[in-house]
Amino acid sequence: MKSVRYLIGLFAFIACYYLLPISTRLLWQPDETRYAEISREMLASGDWIVPHLLGLRYFEKPIAGYWINSIGQWLFGANNFGVRAGVIFATLLTAALVTWFTLRLWRDKRLALLATVIYLSLFIVYAIGTYAVLDPFIAFWLVAGMCSFWLAMQAQTWRGKSAGFLLLGITCGMGVMTKGFLALAVPVLSVLPWVATQKRWKDLFIYGWLAVISCVLTVLPWGLAIAQREPNFWHYFFWVEHIQRFALDDAQHRAPFWYYVPVIIAGSLPWLGLLPGALYTGWKNRKHSATVYLLSWTIMPLLFFSVAKGKLPTYILSCFASLAMLMAHYALLAAKNNPLALRINGWINIAFGVTGIIATFVVSPWGPMNTPVWQTFESYKVFCAWSIFSLWAFFGWYTLTNVEKTWPFAALCPLGLALLVGFSIPDRVMEGKHPQFFVEMTQESLQPSRYILTDSVGVAAGLAWSLQRDDIIMYRQTGELKYGLNYPDAKGRFVSGDEFANWLNQHRQEGIITLVLSVDRDEDINSLAIPPADAIDRQERLVLIQYRPK
């Protein structure tokens, strides 16, 4: 009966965090609008080989993540939940692997359930796992690869070892098809310390080639298909998206070596109090094979991405699966022997919630700021934000009431965030970061437009997805579409600022021309170097400018 209650509680937890509130949040640009539109175009065109964005070749990532996203929109429709369904599914599958792996290591159902709940409630996992990017997919394949390798190395027969390594190769191949060759580097780096300390080189060298073969066979069909369709794909993807992105001096998203320290700290909420003890206990028990494996799984990718010049928080998502298992194991030990860390965790959550309440007041219309984040007419959003932090502090306090028994309720600290964050976003943020909000405000003007031009790729993708059209023209800036715009068949999909007046004269009689520009909040739109318009509709950071036929 207790197991049934636990399962019901887990399903309710998943529903409240990962299912019910997802549709209430508008898509963010540039990431979510980009991936939503790529998948929409894949469904509309039926081309499941070459990814396109706004009808242009888009070679920043391989194809597998777009497949999953497209299936999500196919099943649930072109809506907010449909766009995010794929990443939610991947996150829940990763949580299932955490459950399975914890059970395999410790044979403890309660520990497995706690590890799963901790993983799903970690701030970084929840933030990325409900956000339509490709990182939850690659995290799933990396976690599946680590589970497969352990399965292979623990097998007692050659059939079991062979099956494990073949499965490892498939997961690595799918990882390559999701986000590239890092799906090969990260698992190798993660297992090497364990292989070295356990002296398991023989099995690795005897059976490792099976993983190589299955990885190649997994990638080969699509790899050959896209090479035939687009011969330049692999050169661009390998050199620009791997070497330049991570290693060269002009790498994207450059950050210092210590970049991931605050990411780990913030990402570990609401379980931050367990982080030091989990790592220390893991190190102290390093003679235990499973503990070494989890430590290596956590630390090696972190070091690898810290050394790389290009960094983003999403890169280390897979590390939190092993970290959740270490935290759950340590938490049960602490609850049994010395609950000091659990008390500290409760106070950290109280402090975080109270700090959030104070910060919300400071940036509210009733605070001391001259330009508050929320305006007076958005008072309900302020109360939503207060509720988010109040619930965080409340559950932090509740875990202290009988800490040996109530500490797991820290998983409910982000409940207010999950349910209310979509209702608390300030209008000034929505107007710049949520193209759907802009489209809703200007739908009647946008719909009949013959041509739509914009100076932001993220906004362009949002307009294309909302209006179900991929012919949005880039104005003045190419952004990440620079490569696709270089192809001869992309002629006419970009108009520079200097050419706009002539372009307008040539196309004005064909129908309404709409220009959507991103501007600074205090920028005077009358100073823009554009021909006089027939209509202007400013929505704070986005401006709709229209030219009608004459």
From Swiss-Prot:
InterPro entries: ArnT_tfrase (IPR022839), Glyco_trans_39/83 (IPR003342), LipidA_mod_glycosyltrf_83 (IPR050297). Coiled coil: none annotated. Its main location: membrane. This is Undecaprenyl phosphate-alpha-4-amino-4-deoxy-L-arabinose arabinosyl transferase. One of its GO terms (biological process) is lipid A biosynthetic process. Catalyzes the transfer of the L-Ara4N moiety of the glycolipid undecaprenyl phosphate-alpha-L-Ara4N to lipid A. The modified arabinose is attached to lipid A and is required for resistance to polymyxin and cationic antimicrobial peptides. Pathway: Lipopolysaccharide metabolism; 4-amino-4-deoxy-beta-L-arabinose-lipid A biosynthesis. The chain crosses the membrane at residues 7-27, 81-101, 111-133, 137-154, 165-185, 204-224, 255-275, 288-308, 315-335, 346-366, 382-402, 406-426. Its EC number is 2.4.2.43. It catalyses: 4-amino-4-deoxy-alpha-L-arabinopyranosyl di-trans,octa-cis-undecaprenyl phosphate + lipid IVA = lipid IIA + di-trans,octa-cis-undecaprenyl phosphate. Belongs to the glycosyltransferase 83 family. The gene is arnT. GO terms for molecular function: 4-amino-4-deoxy-L-arabinose transferase activity; mannosyltransferase activity.
